[in-house]
Each structure stands twice: as C-alpha cells, then as structure tokens.
Design a protein with these regions (language model features):
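Helix-adjacent hinge/juxtasegments
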Residues: 49-82
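Short, well-structured N-terminal submotif of metal-dependent ribonuclease cores
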Residues: 1-39, 50-63, 137, 143-145
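Short active-site oxyanion
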Residues: 30-33, 74-76, 115-120
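Acidic catalytic patch
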Residues: 39-40, 70-95, 102-107
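Acidic, PIN/NYN-like endoribonuclease modules and their adjacent C-terminal/linker elements
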Residues: 2, 106, 110-145
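Alpha-helical elements of the RecA-like P-loop NTPase motor core of helicases
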Residues: 21, 86, 129-130
C-alpha cells in the first residue's frame, strides 16, 4: 500500500502518543511511505519543542532524532520544487490551508498525479484530513481508530 504521511502523523513514529501504534505498524509491513522534504525540518523541530517543554528528556530526544535520521532514507521523499508546487495557487484558492499543510497536500497530489495510483493520506489534523478527502484522497487519522 502507498501512504503519504504529513508531519502530524510522522511524529507519532518517534514520540509515543495517541495513534503511535498504528503509525508503527506502517513500518512493519511492505508499504511505500511518502513524505515531503519539509517533514525533515518539521519533525526535528517538533521533537526539539517536546524537549524544551520537558515532554522528552535529552536522552530520549537524541534517541528519537537519531532514529528518525537513520530511517529517513526509507521514505520516498519529494523535494520542494516548482513542479511539486504547480497546483499550489489553485489549491489554496479552493481551501483555507496553512502554509505547511498546503505544502503537504500539494506534495501528495503531485505524487498521486505522477504515480497514477491511490495514496492513503495519513494525518492527525482534522481540517487537513477533511481537505484531503475533498481532493479525492482516502484519509486516515491515526488518532481516530
């Protein structure tokens, strides 16, 4: 199966919270996991914020960040390019999206168009899930099992 993970879903792989078990299961199967290059910065920043807010110890932060960096090569990563952003203006005209949400959805649309395949959009943000559904994606929110 092919999955696109936005950062709200991806973080559940490296920080235990509601929906983490489901996200972990994606890594145990022979799935294709797609992400945007921006997820790299977003994920590390999210882990650092959890460290600052004392939700992660320094040791656990380092462990999570290193694990993420090691697994990064397992993802199919879309670079942030003009080709990926070709439909960005039309997308934000149709939907009230925040900047990085627009990048993630635009990237998933680019993957779908390029592969001509169904992609399950995985996201823990209800608004982005609803928008992705409107754009024709199958959607899974790991927090709503």
């Amino acid at each position: 199966m092919i999955y696109y993970l936005d950062t709200s879903a991806l973080v559940k792989r490296y920080y235990e919270e509601q929906g983490s078990a489901w996200v972990h299961s994606l890594f145990q199967l022979e799935n294709v996991l797609m992400v945007s290059k921006v997820a790299y910065a977003e994920l590390l920043a999210a882990l650092a914020r959890k460290r600052r807010e004392k939700e992660l110890t320094e040791v656990n932060f380092t462990r999570a960040a290193e694990s993420f960096q090691q697994e990064w090569k397992e993802f199919v990563v879309a670079e942030v390019t003009e080709a990926v952003f070709a439909d960005l203006l039309a997308l934000v005209k149709r939907h009230p999206l925040r900047g990085f949400d627009a990048i993630h959805l635009c990237t998933a649309l680019w993957f779908r168009k390029r592969l001509k395949a169904d992609i399950l959009f995985v996201c823990a943000d209800r608004n982005l899930c609803a928008t992705a559904e409107t754009e024709g994606f199958g959607v899974h929110n790991p927090e709503q099992q």
